[in-house]
Amino acid sequence: LGLTTDNSNLLGISSEGSFGEADKSTTSFIGLEFLKRMKEYYSKSSFHIGQTSSVFNQMGMIEDIEDTYFSSFDFGIYKENIFTDRDSFGIEVYQPLRSELASMNLNLPVGRTKDKQILFENFSLDLTPSGRQINSQLVYSTNTRYFSFFGKLGLVSDEFHVKESSVKPYFQLDIEINLK
């Protein structure tokens, strides 16, 4: 459960000049996390939701950003002690932070009058992503006195929450050597 307030930017991003400036941004969020152990197996899961409200009182192209709602989740099942007493293997499914509902209202210049006054028109821009990124991956980790190893092999659909018809594979390998 949390609340953040920022008087000079929106979600850590500041703007000035013709875009306008956020006078206040408030983000509230709640999350649930679970851990269940069953002998050599365990499962972890979490779910987070939140909402951001912002106020634009300055003159600029951004008239306002309506309340934004976002979510993320993950679930994993792991087995410990596969090859050594300090390793684990698991399968994970997760969704990175995603904006569930977001829109921005813009006040854009579209022309001038004969008296050289600028004409503005309001536009509403839907910022809600077209897709939902889901990652599914196999993970393995081990630690010894001299090194740590972590690897994952996975598939991602709708990467960056952009609707696609393809599923992309990925691989990551981290090796740390202890020099002590």
List PLM regions with ranges:
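Outer membrane beta-barrel transmembrane domains
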Residues: L1-K24, F29-R37, K44-S157, H161-S165
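Outer-membrane beta-barrel "beta-signal"
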Residues: I77, S88, S166-K180
